[in-house]
């Protein structure tokens, strides 16, 4: 599956003790690199992206993948990641920048930065002021993936499919347990969604809001059949679950798979009317990168519109590259759940870093919820 298994909240205090230490590392000198080490989310790239880069540049690429921001962050904070390109989520990158784990981009070597949408770049600047460290890989939203036929069968034609109530109203979820209810194993996504259902700030720094969200989650806990951030799209496509808290592109892939397989049911993704989280995954160069020159070449290559579009066509996540959209398959380019319209974008909230206090609280409550509430 195209899993960009995103955010398991990590205590922000871990980053706090690291701030300033990483700045002692020296950036690599740019000098005729012949290799590049890339660390990205699993199944988050087109099949020919790496081979074509190698043919174009003669640079050998070692391409590894991870399945959570925690995994990446652990490597970065250790001080010797061994990678030249990493792809953190923007709210994680914000604290990592403070910790000094990245080197500034040499924008003179990345002319394709001119292709980036200034509106989206201004949103990323909330985490990366001046866009000095990160270049967008892809972006997406948190929402609900569901099996249309299964939901109608159990909830009727008037099911609130445009609302978080579909997932957080215990009366609804009790009727859906029999066909499978999946939640991302990602506390910040789950708590943010619950907060939006309640009409509260999904980036709240008020502990009381998280305790209130926990009470909402406790009421539906008996009906959640799995916590899964890796296989839920496959489960939706295979009719093993009928509803999921998920990420837009993953559900898009599930929808395509059911269509390609000629299934009798249809998968749909919705950005709820109450709002949802908006997030960006960005390419960044670690402070200790051994091949910074090759890293700049890679970033410039990825921001070529045709290269960029090929990635979107594979993973169902849009990018901030404006010219690339002309090369995206029409069915994807005009899908409002991929390139969301302005009225939907206006109700999205950019995911922001949790404070150390909230991160600890959220983790504790999440473990309690998973163990039975």
What spans do the regions from the language model cover?
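Short beta-strand->loop
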Residues: 103-114, 165, 261-277, 286-288
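Conserved C-terminal helix/tail region of periplasmic/extracytoplasmic solute-binding proteins
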Residues: 234, 342-373
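Early extracytoplasmic/lumenal segment of secretory-pathway proteins
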Residues: 30-96
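A structural signal for short loop-to-beta-strand junctions that line the ligand-binding cleft
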Residues: 81-85, 103-108, 112-149
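A bilobed periplasmic-binding-protein/Venus flytrap-type ligand-binding module shared by bacterial periplasmic
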Residues: 145-150, 196-199, 279-291, 310
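Mature extracytoplasmic/periplasmic domains
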Residues: 286-347
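Ligand-binding "clamshell"
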Residues: 97-105, 122-124, 128-131, 223, ...
């Amino acid at each position: 599956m195209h899993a960009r298994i995103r955010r398991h909240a990590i205590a922000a205090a871990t980053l706090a003790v690291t701030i300033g230490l990483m700045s002692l590392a020296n950036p690599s000198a740019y000098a005729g690199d012949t290799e590049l080490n890339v660390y990205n989310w699993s199944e988050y790239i087109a099949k020919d992206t790496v081979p074509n880069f190698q043919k174009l540049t003669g640079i050998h690429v070692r391409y590894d993948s991870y399945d959570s921001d925690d995994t990446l962050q652990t490597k970065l904070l250790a001080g010797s990641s061994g990678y030249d390109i990493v792809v953190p989520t923007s709210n994680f990158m914000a604290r990592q920048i403070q910790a000094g784990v990245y080197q500034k981009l040499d924008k003179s070597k990345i002319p394709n930065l001119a292709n980036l949408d200034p509106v989206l770049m201004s949103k990323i600047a909330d985490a990366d002021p001046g866009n000095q460290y990160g270049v967008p890989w892809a972006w997406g939203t948190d929402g609900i993936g569901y099996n249309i036929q299964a939901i109608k069968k159990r909830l009727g034609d008037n099911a609130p499919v445009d609302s978080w109530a579909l997932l957080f109203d215990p009366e609804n979820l009790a009727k859906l347990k029999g066909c499978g209810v999946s939640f991302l194993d990602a506390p910040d996504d789950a708590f943010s969604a619950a907060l939006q259902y309640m009409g509260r700030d999904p980036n709240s720094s008020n502990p009381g809001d998280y305790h209130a969200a926990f009470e909402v989650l406790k009421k539906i806990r008996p009906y959640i059949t799995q916590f899964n951030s890796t296989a839920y799209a496959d489960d939706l496509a295979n009719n093993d679950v009928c509803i999921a808290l998920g990420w837009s592109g993953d559900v898009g892939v599930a929808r395509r798979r059911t269509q390609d397989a000629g299934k009798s049911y249809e998968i749909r993704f919705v950005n709820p009317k109450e709002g949802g989280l908006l997030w960006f995954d960005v390419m960044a160069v670690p402070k200790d990168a051994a091949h910074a020159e090759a890293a700049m070449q890679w970033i410039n290559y990825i921001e070529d519109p045709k290269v960029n579009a090929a990635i979107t066509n594979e993973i169902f996540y849009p990018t901030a590259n404006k010219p690339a959209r002309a090369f995206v398959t029409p069915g994807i380019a005009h899908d409002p759940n991929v390139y969301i319209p302005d009225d939907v974008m206006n109700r999205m909230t950019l995911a922001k870093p949790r404070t150390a206090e909230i991160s600890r609280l959220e983790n504790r409550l999440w473990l309690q919820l998973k163990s039975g509430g």
